[in-house]
Amino acid sequence: MQEKYSTEIEKILSKYPADRKRSAVLPLLYIAQQEYGYCTPDAIREVAAIAEVEPTEVDAVVGFYTLFFDHPVGKHVVQVCNDLPCALRGSEQFLDHACKKLGVDKHQVEHGGATTADGQFTLESVVCLAACDKAPMLQIDLEFFERLTPEEFDRLIEEYKTNKHSERSEA
């Protein structure tokens, strides 16, 4: 990673004082995840070495943020909010539908995520995606989709399967 992304890494490190390299952990992890598909143990050690922190500190960051993964995930990551406002507006039934549509086990989805047999999608149930007034909602990769119906979910999945989805803003 250091050799391939040396320019990007130097640019990131230049944003922080020399004695505060640990501040670069998040952007360095983003590079690692882009390169390997998830934050591998080797990538975590490499980020730790660059940021001059212990690997356990970097691993804790990976474990804290829902957009960093410590295990292989599908091409697209689908995160369904399960927090109280979304639950009150049907996220549990929505998650049932999503599991059925993608053919994954709900228990796995609720305990770390489940990936489809073809490797296209990983479905996760997560706590709060910060759009409580627009429930039920989900995030696919980095894009939010709000006030979704099961039919709209099915359409989105088909668009992502066929690469016909173009990013759009949901209001």
Give the positions of each predicted feature.
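Signature of N-terminal electron-transfer/Fe-S-associated modules in redox systems
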Residues: M1-A171
